[in-house]
Amino acid sequence: MARLLDSINSPLDVKILNIPQLETLADEIREELISVLSKNGGHLGPNLGVVELTLAMHYVFDTPKDHFVFDVSHQAYVHKLLTGRREQFSMIRTPGGLNGFMLRSESPHDCYGAGHAGTALSAALGMAVARDRVGGNEHVVALAGDAAFTCGITYEALNNIAHQTRRLIVVLNDNEWSIDKNVGAIANYLNTIVTNPRFDYLHESAGRFVERLGGKTALQMARKAEEAAKSILWPSVIFEELGLKYYGPISGHDVATLIKTFEFLKTQKRPVLLHVLTQKGKGFEPALQKQKKFHGLGPYDPETGETKALGQRTYSEVFADTMVKLANMNSKVVAITAAMPNGTGLDRFQPRHPDRYFDVGIAEEHAVIFAAGLATKGLKPFVAIYSTFLQRSLDPIIHDVCLQNLPVVFCMDRGSLSGDDGPTHHGLFDISYLRGIPNLVHMVPKDEDELADMLFTAMQHDGPIAVRYPRGVGPGTPVKDVPRAIPIGQAELLQHGEHDRVAIFALGSLVPLAQEVAAKLEGEGISAAVINGRFAKPIDVRMVEFYGRSVDAIVTMEDHVLEGGFGSAVLERLSDLGLQTPVVRVGWPDQFIEHGKPDALRARYGISVENTLEKLRRVLDQRAAEKIAHAAAKA
């Protein structure tokens, strides 16, 4: 039997369906999500929860003329299925396939790209204001999850919406089911009243009557009584205080009610907020039972939901276990996360030291300033935030931590590629945006044991210090029971010969690649030293000077953009020393890197043994030719 889903090539195909057909389509979409993501991985739970909601939005509105702005946009898979990308959906999050987030370059239906939380309302407001200025009539709908409302940017937007536009629809997708069923039932009943256009007319008429009857005092009393009732029955009076008309909460899985509600909201001449209750993971029992796991995950069994074990500890797990160890050693150690306890591994720390664990929500700036405050009172805060999300905290890092030289530790998970999540999540910029800040130390471990040592070093350091480490598993180096401190700014000489022609300075996960390059050179009769840089700042100037004066070429290798990175730091020091030693830099180019498997992406962008050797041979050949020419000139 043919699926309805197979006939959906654009939102126009959704609009011709009746309610029973839409409900059937919702079931088929869930089956498609479960099947495809079992192979590719992705954000299964959030997308299972927004199927009916997305169907209703496309049934009522007209993209791409109307604009849907998804906060984070990890819950946009259903939107992609309905907007001409159904045939490509099986390749989502695979090389050359659909991105797991919204991309303006991917489809005209994707009006705004995203990957970080809290951006939807500000972007949607910008679109609405631009529309108003040119006299457009398109609708702008911002869809944000309840987690986005822990993000300060969302409230900055809310504070401006009512003052800057009269037509904007905000959908609050509440998938935590935190509202009691009885309260929800009363609110739904009230919502059937307030979504009737006659309600606003009667409401305003009653207001005018009360004003004539008893003046403004009576009107103010009536409004206070209304607000008091709302505070009991409606949990979101704050939105109306900010100038948005609040509707809800309503079920996010009742497609008929959603359609009716959106049709009504289209007629409103003021900013509105619709509060929708959805169930994350709906339609897949394993996702309902383990919502954290199925928020975002790799491939899994589509029947049981079981995922394949990695076989060894990830860097995040090593970080978490080391944090527990450090907290046992030092009562001043505290841990902070910005709504990512599972992703950073701090969910292992929390049960062991609950009074020293702080989840501040999606509030990276607050996390850093909060840590600064803790540090002023003698505590040792470790702030665990993905490299890509720490970008949001640059001003507090400079102004509140480094300027005051406070001993805050920044633990930057995903400090490298983030694989299938793509450019919004790759952590390839932190060395560049942190290296120029006075007082800050920046470390990069080559393996799991060195990560533990660096965290121990950070605990003892009396000043701001950062450590970046990659996603996933490391080389499998055992972690010793007692970590040791590493002297600040001291690189590690891993191998060298009596007459090295090449010195390879490598950072972090590229140290093994450097050793492979050295082995290949050895096979060609070229001796090469390999140095584990360990510090992006301060770099080991003495080591750089020694090899800058003694070798024919230096190679730098980093899992980071070349602009302003570790290689740039080495070049700067050589320049300061007046040395002109040729430098071959290996790292990521000055562009945003697409999603894909890390090994494949590195090969594509030349972060490989072969490409490094090719570039190095050219430099060595040129150097040899210069020596011959110099000798001939002297003769």
Predicted regions and their residues:
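Glycine-/acidic-rich phosphate or pyrophosphate-binding loops and their flanking alpha/beta elements
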Residues: K260-E263, H295-G296, T314-M329, G345-P351, ...
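Structural signature of the thiamine diphosphate
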Residues: A218-P286, P407-M412, I431-D481, S608-A635
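N-terminal amphipathic, basic-rich helices that act as targeting or association modules
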Residues: M1-T83, I238-I259, Q268, V272-T278
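Long, well-ordered, tryptophan-enriched scaffold segments
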Residues: N175-F319
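Peripheral docking tails and interdomain loops at the edges
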Residues: P299-P302, T307-G311, G419-D421, L440-V441, ...
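Non-catalytic terminal/interface segments that mediate subunit docking, oligomerization
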Residues: D66-H67, R270, T278-L390, P396-L406, ...
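Cofactor-binding active-site loop characterized by glycine-rich and histidine/acidic residues
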Residues: H43-Q164, Y315, K332-V333, T337-A338, ...
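A glycine-rich helix N-cap at a beta->alpha junction
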Residues: E87-G100, H163-W177, R198, F358, ...
